[in-house]
Amino acid sequence: MLDEQTTKALIKKMFEKQDELNIHTNGSDWRNNKNLNWRRAIWTECAELLDYTNWKWWRQQDISMKDIEMELIDIWHFLMSDLMINNS
């Protein structure tokens, strides 16, 4: 288990890296781009995540933990972006 200081440092680093990624993909003014709807992106990823579970009672489907993990990572990226805009 990580101590609180290490955990905070790792989370801070994740947000810094997300900011770098957003600058690379969306430009240095990404925080002011009103066309980037992070919450819609989160909802979309949530819907995609459901497709990798067996929630559809009309169809037999295997659960894909690898794909679920990828969707959760995508959700985390979009959530960090939204938090950087709405909590700065």
Regions found by a protein language model. Name each.
Residues 1-88:
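Flexible "arm" and connector segments at domain edges
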